[in-house]
Amino acid sequence: WIEEKSLIVGDLHLEKSTSYIDQGNFLPPYDTIDTLERLLNITKELSPNRIIFLGDVFHDNSAFDRLKKKEKQLFKDILKKNVIWVKGNHDNNFKYVNIKTYTSYKLKKFIFSHISDKKNKLEISAHYHPKVTFKFKGTKISKPCFLIDKEKIILPAYGAYTGGLNISSDIYKNVFLNDYQIYALGNTKVLKIEKKF
């Protein structure tokens, strides 16, 4: 958000890979370092005055305790910015020194929440991890995406191991009253995608 010098991200799901160990499943434990390094790099590049986290920063309430020393330092470096922390469904009991958490947050006319509420006007949310699948030069491609209409924006998940809910899901009909636009994350730019269902 250029006018407010704000960086808005959701669904980092830090330490998702290590959360599966208790279930006997092992994933390469590099999701947290990748996500934090990308976030720190973008904060250095854009120099926002504030970061607005739209929930599920951590995959569970004990994830912070599983961070390695380097990851904790990266996290602390990111938190040197002014932080608005909206709680998600995965980290709703997370507490960290000197960080106030919100169930939703209003800035100017916008409401920032983790899960979209149909009653909210001018809302920016996360939670659904939207993704779009399309063909490009005969190859099927799936990409995280923004979903945007006149009143709402749903952000793509920022975390490395987040997966996604395809835009063809009926769940999005419960969020958007109007038809929405799709903007997929490319390697170097955001691409508008035409809906063809």
Could you tell me what each predicted segment is?
Residues 1-54, 58-197:
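Extended recognition/assembly regions associated with phosphoester-bond processing machinery
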